[in-house]
């Protein structure tokens, strides 16, 4: 189930994922005076992706009993860390 959910996320949010990669490259190449602005742009996009993933996770969790939901949440978060690490840093905060 989680694999399919992440497949859908990657398909639906392919543009966001590509923009995050580009923003990461721009941040890495930014001169010192532009680095803060580049990082803020990158962080905003990462935060958007993380929120979208958390919404996907939470919507499915609401269909599960409490014990199963906790196991699913942990498994989902691990899968995000492995498959979409850019969006995993704060996934547990949402």
Task: Cite the ranges covered by each PLM segment.
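Amphipathic alpha-helical binding modules
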Residues: 62-94
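Non-transmembrane, amphipathic alpha-helical segments
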Residues: 1-8, 30, 34-41, 68
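Short terminal alpha-helical segments
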Residues: 1-29
